[in-house]
Amino acid sequence: MTGRTQIFLGLLGAGLLGQGAASLVLDALGLANDHLPQRFANSDPLHASIHVIWGAAMIALVLTGLSDADATKLALIFGIFYTGLAIAGLTFHHPLGMRLDRGENVFHLLVGPASLAVGLASGLRLRERPA
């Protein structure tokens, strides 16, 4: 069954994969910079690779028929990870050597809690289902 949580994860995964891959390509070609539209592509290869890995994993899991319970867990795990990344980016200058600046921190502050909210709502829906 493909529910709302799987759709959210699939779309989020596609966005992360696309953004991360574009970042890596622009960086490899020496075209990454702080001007739009390239600014949406982070020139930090480690950070871009994290987006690619999360995006590819989300897409693969959704396409293999991720159950509602597992989709809930994935949304919560991703939400915790990205909310933590946002907090680290706000607390430390370039945590773990990643260039996390204002734009990246804002993105992580949006997508992390949003994923937590989706995961929590999905978990509540699962608990309310008749056995």
Residues covered by each model-derived region:
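Membrane-interface extramembranous regions
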Residues: 1-131
